Amino acid sequence: MVKLGFSRELRLLTPSHFKCVFQKPLRVSTPEITILARKNNLEHSRLGLTVAKKHLKRAHDRNRVKRISRESFRLLQGQLANYDFVIITKKGIGNLDNQQLFQTLDKLWKRHIRLVQKS
């Protein structure tokens, strides 16, 4: 049975972890969100989030996006290969409600899964 938690070991925590992902990543994106991915040598996937104040001024909006992003990752982590992921938000992210954001992320995760299976 797959554990669906989001413990500390499932997060990208240090700048060096993020730098690794930014070097030659697999990229899937929409106008509002980009997900970068890079293979890791662990037995699980990890997630890092970047939500800029430039795109979402209020903290509660940034927290909402991060909360929904973590939840979508948590639910699909059993299907995701051993990759490190960084979710980068873009300008139109504030226009999406919770359901649209979750659907967009789900679509991007599924696109990533197909991309990995092809390669």
Swiss-Prot record:
GO terms for cellular component: ribonuclease P complex. InterPro entries: Ribosomal_Su5_D2-typ_SF (IPR020568), Ribsml_uS5_D2-typ_fold_subgr (IPR014721), RNase_P (IPR000100). Keywords: Endonuclease, Hydrolase, Nuclease, RNA-binding, tRNA processing. Its EC number is 3.1.26.5. Pfam families: Ribonuclease_P (PF00825). Disulfide bonds: none annotated. One of its GO terms (biological process) is tRNA 5'-leader removal. It catalyses: Endonucleolytic cleavage of RNA, removing 5'-extranucleotides from tRNA precursor. It is an enzyme of class 3 (hydrolase). GO terms for molecular function: 3'-tRNA processing endoribonuclease activity; ribonuclease P activity; tRNA binding. RNaseP catalyzes the removal of the 5'-leader sequence from pre-tRNA to produce the mature 5'-terminus. It can also cleave other RNA substrates such as 4.5S RNA. The protein component plays an auxiliary but essential role in vivo by binding to the 5'-leader sequence and broadening the substrate specificity of the ribozyme. Consists of a catalytic RNA component (M1 or rnpB) and a protein subunit. PANTHER family: RIBONUCLEASE P PROTEIN COMPONENT. Belongs to the RnpA family. This is Ribonuclease P protein component. It comes from Histophilus somni (strain 2336). The lineage of its organism: Bacteria, Pseudomonadati, Pseudomonadota, Gammaproteobacteria, Pasteurellales. The gene is rnpA.
